[in-house]
Structure formats: C-alpha cells, structure tokens
Amino acid sequence: MKKKIILTGGGTAGHVTPNISLIPKLKELGYEVQYIGTKDGIEKSLIKKEGIKYHEISSGKLRRYFDLKNFTDPFKVLKGIMEARKIIKKEKPNIVFSKGGFVAVPVVIGAYLNKVPVISHESDMTPGLANKLSTPYCNKVCVTFPETLKYIKKDKGVLTGTPIREELFLGNEEKGKKICGFKDNKPIVLLVGGSLGSKILNNLIRENIEELLKKFNIIHICGKGNIEKTLENKEGYAQFEYVKEELPHFMKASNIVISRAGANSIFELLALAKPNLLVPLSKKASRGDQILNAKSFEKNGYSLVLEEEELSKKIFLDKLNYLYENREKYIKNMKNSSFKNGIDNIIDLIEKYYTMKN
C-alpha cells in the first residue's frame, strides 16, 4: 500500500517553508505528498513549484481584534472544514502534518473527522491562535523551544526543533555577489523583511542608505510591491520583492543579517551561524511572540535585538556597527549551540504514526 501524507499551512512563508523542507525526505521514504491550502495564499505559489498535488479550500482569517469580517469569516472556516473533510475522505492519507496559519484549522478538523492522525508544529515560543484551536484535534504537537511545552497538554507536546531547508546550506558566495551586481569586496548586509515585507525595516534601510553604503553593500528583500524605483540603479544596493532559489547564495555572501524575529527565520540564521540584528514585531502589531523569540536568542548570545519602540537612526547604526565589529563572538556562540535541524525528529514521528495506523 502506498504511503500518503497531506501537508497544510499558510498565510505567510513561515507557515510554508518548514513543510517544503520535509518534502524531499518524505519522497525519499516513499510518501506521496499532497498539500491543502487556500485559493490565493502565498502557499499556493510556493507549493506549485514543488510539483506536488495542491488542493484549494476556503478559509477565513482568525483575528484577535475587531473587524467586520469577523462576522463572515467563521462561515468561511465552516465551509473550509467541509471541503477539507471531503478532500481527505477521497485522498485517504495515512497522516496529516500541519504547520499552522489560518488555513490549517479546517484541515486539521477535517482530518480528525476522518479519523486520520494529525501532527502539528509550533515554531514560536507561545502557540499561535490557529495552533491553539487545532491542538485538541491533533495527536502530537511538535515544538521548537523547550519553554513551549508548558503551553501544550503533556501527552501531546514533543520537542523536535524546527525543520531547516537543506538547500540553505548550499549557497555560493560568488554567485550571490554576481546576482546582486556587487563588484567590490565591501562587507554585505542582508535585510530580510519576511514574505509580506516590512514597512518599518524597508524605511530603516532606505532612510539610512547613504550612510550604510559608505561601509556596506546591501541586499534588501523588501516584500511584494515594495520595490523603490528611485533606488533601482544604486551602486552597492540590490533589492528584491521575494527570493527562493537565490536565498542560499545571499545568505552565504552576507556578513550580517537584519531580520524580523519569526521562529523559522531566526533558527535558519542560527543553523547558518549568521550574525544578526533582530527587529521583532511590536506587541501593537502582534501577540508578542517575536519579542519572546528575540529575547531568548539575545540571552543565549546568538542575536542583537533592536525593538521598534527604540528605533532611531543613531541606535540602528550603532547596533549594526557593533554587531559587525563583534561578529566573531556571535558566530562562536551560534556554532556552540546545541540546536539540531528538526527534520529527522519530525520525520521519525510521522513514520511512527504511519506504522501505528498500518
């Protein structure tokens, strides 16, 4: 009998890339891999590139704040549950793996209604709303931080680490520089604003561009629709809406990285031992998970943190220069970390549940 698994997760790239990192190993073990996502989420374009079957369902966004859509989106979620249940009943997967995000809730419930085992993964230190709603229907919940286990029912939580894409380790420094058109040997700052971009980070770089270019070349991943036309031919500055194949080369070429503090991103930086300046989303714009992630990494000596509330030109440039001058200390701390890539732990758990069901 053929092994079959359905993956789900979406809304941002952080809910998709960990799933993508599992696909090669799953295929190697003989699994037919399929995906359930939304009709127009970022997961659709990312997964289509992987050449696996993609199923579309409806899904409403889960919000912690007042919005008129809060009155209509629950009906979209109910519709999504019915659609996911129908897909899962037809495809008969042995297991469902969820990476969270609002699309995951209907899929997890749909699997539960079909008596299909579900394993989910929470990257952040505290569970997101989608994973909180999904947990009662999951057999196991994988976590990245040991501190997260206290939020999960004891018999469900498993410390696995987060899965890191193998291709990230295969970057070529010269190729990265060539793509960006850099001709000198200035140190390189890579800014990663996330798949949706970050207005604050984009402005931070662009408002200080002249000062930064005196010392650094800059690779700026700014998010969809955020290209600044007036800077398109600026020497030493390369901007991209979103990258995939190029990212390993950009990571390899960069000396320091500026990033938000989503768990997937920061654990990739840790795995690559890249000195980093983290600018976590403020509590006004999030549930505060990125602040907790960033503080944990700063405490362990892996990162330097700049909170949005203390943003100023002077503090930003001072911290960036401090990070560059002390980069070897951060590299050493990261290389001495006990962190391990979570791929094997998660795959072992998937295999365990496949064996139990069959």
UniProtKB/Swiss-Prot annotation:
EC number(s) from the headed UniProt entry: 2.4.1.227
PANTHER family: UDP-N-ACETYLGLUCOSAMINE--N-ACETYLMURAMYL-(PENTAPEPTIDE) PYROPHOSPHORYL-UNDECAPRENOL N-ACETYLGLUCOSAMINE TRANSFERASE, UDP-N-ACETYLGLUCOSAMINE--N-ACETYLMURAMYL-(PENTAPEPTIDE) PYROPHOSPHORYL-UNDECAPRENOL N-ACETYLGLUCOSAMINE TRANSFERASE 1
Subcellular localization: Cell membrane
SUPFAM superfamilies named in the record: UDP-Glycosyltransferase/glycogen phosphorylase
Protein name: UDP-N-acetylglucosamine--N-acetylmuramyl-(pentapeptide) pyrophosphoryl-undecaprenol N-acetylglucosamine transferase
Family membership: Belongs to the glycosyltransferase 28 family. MurG subfamily.
Enzyme class: transferase
Catalytic activity: di-trans,octa-cis-undecaprenyl diphospho-N-acetyl-alpha-D-muramoyl-L-alanyl-D-glutamyl-meso-2,6-diaminopimeloyl-D-alanyl-D-alanine + UDP-N-acetyl-alpha-D-glucosamine = di-trans,octa-cis-undecaprenyl diphospho-[N-acetyl-alpha-D-glucosaminyl-(1->4)]-N-acetyl-alpha-D-muramoyl-L-alanyl-D-glutamyl-meso-2,6-diaminopimeloyl-D-alanyl-D-alanine + UDP + H(+)
Recorded superkingdom: Bacteria
Gene3D superfamilies named in the record: Glycogen Phosphorylase B (3.40.50.2000)
Disulfide bonds: none
Pathway: Cell wall biogenesis; peptidoglycan biosynthesis
Organism of origin: Clostridium tetani (strain Massachusetts / E88)
Topology class, membrane: Peripheral membrane protein
Pfam family, one: Glyco_transf_28
